[in-house]
């Protein structure tokens, strides 16, 4: 499965004004809901917060990848959010974030581990990340991932 198959155009938001972790998670959960794969948004949001309580999902270079497995997720999917202004996502993070990818995965199965590994491999390429930050539309963002 290609990573772009886990997105849809409606699950990508660019230039968000979200200013803190709560607003970011709210917006990303709404973007995830565009897939129609969350049977309970509140339960999924609770799963994200529980995962964040274990350890920060801030990666590096302004990138954060919140993710959770939950019974309310019917199939794996990705959502992306790019912020207008970088923010401190978690008090323990070393830097501010402006580029976030949320992975939703069903409770059973391990596809989310493959998704996370492939996404992380892509995000380690600074040129690729710079291209994502320069995109103007969700379609261009998705095309950049697919290139």
Could you say what each language-model-derived stretch is?
Residues 1-147:
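Cytosolic covalent-transfer regions centered on His/Cys nucleophiles
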